[in-house]
Amino acid sequence: MNDIWWQTIGEGDCHLVLLHGWGLNAQVWDCITPQLASHFTLHLVDLPGYGRSGGFGAMSLEAMAQRVLEQAPPQAVWLGWSLGGLVASQVAIMRPERVQALVTVASSPCFAARDDWPGIKPEVLAGFQQQLSDDFQRTVERFLALQTMGTESARQDARALKQAVLSLPMPSAEALNGGLEILRTVDLRQALVRLPMPFLRLYGRLDGLVPRKIVPLLDDLWPESESILFDKAAHAPFVSHPAAFCEPLLALKTRLG
């Protein structure tokens, strides 16, 4: 069985596993690892099929979560961005005793819009799947541009994300398609209602992929969780506002003792 790429850096008895989003890899965290590494032992992961974790095709959300768990420390804070937020959430559902706290970033338990739920139109996600087979690299680049749109530093932020993608092998079309299928079909809203661990949700007000309308809906659905909305950030708040992004993570660590 292939191992997934996993790097451990930093110091501190609190372990923090960082899971990236669709199409990307662990390089996206470069802008915050210096701030966090003096407080946490960081676990930087390329999800199966992405970056340096080649040799994986399309996987279900459960299979991806299980694969990451196999290499993870016995206990950690799990932080997932976008698609990575679904993987971290699935880990918390499957093995709650291994998750000290769950942090989701610009993520939704249900990315696709439903009758009663704001999200990405399913036909947009299906369109991305179609475009992937036509023009792989351009589709990924379009998706990256969408993630930073609207912020004051949009161009620079998109460049940082693009650099993270281009610096490593491109994910396979199968892995990318599998990730879009997860975004199109998964709905964890009810499964996350009774999580036993602290649950922190971070959002960008200008996010074009995860609408801010879901924030109060999830505040009602998960009253035990805490939400923070970064006013001038879009889908990648850790890239546009690294210092502000790290503050709630350090506060969470203090609370966990």
UniProtKB/Swiss-Prot annotation:
InterPro entries recorded: AB_hydrolase_1, AB_hydrolase_fold, BioH, Carboxylesterase_BioH
Top-level taxon of the source organism: Bacteria
EC main group: hydrolase
Pfam families for the chain: Abhydrolase_1
GO CC, alphabetical: cytoplasm
Residues annotated as domain AB hydrolase-1: 15-241
Catalytic activity: 6-carboxyhexanoyl-[ACP] methyl ester + H2O = 6-carboxyhexanoyl-[ACP] + methanol + H(+)
GO BP term, pick one: biotin biosynthetic process
UniProt pathway annotation: Cofactor biosynthesis; biotin biosynthesis
Subcellular location: Cytoplasm
Keywords associated with the record: Biotin biosynthesis, Cytoplasm, Hydrolase, Serine esterase
Gene3D superfamilies (UniProt xref): alpha/beta hydrolase
Binding site for substrate: W22, S82, L83, F143, L144, A145, L146, Q147, H235
Record-listed E.C. numbers: 3.1.1.85
Keyword Transit peptide part of the UniProt annotation: no
Entry annotated with the keyword Cytoplasm: yes
Protein task: The physiological role of BioH is to remove the methyl group introduced by BioC when the pimeloyl moiety is complete. It allows to synthesize pimeloyl-ACP via the fatty acid synthetic pathway through the hydrolysis of the ester bonds of pimeloyl-ACP esters.
Assembly and binders: Monomer.
Protein name, UniProt field: Pimeloyl-[acyl-carrier protein] methyl ester esterase
Annotated organism of origin: Klebsiella pneumoniae subsp. pneumoniae (strain ATCC 700721 / MGH 78578)
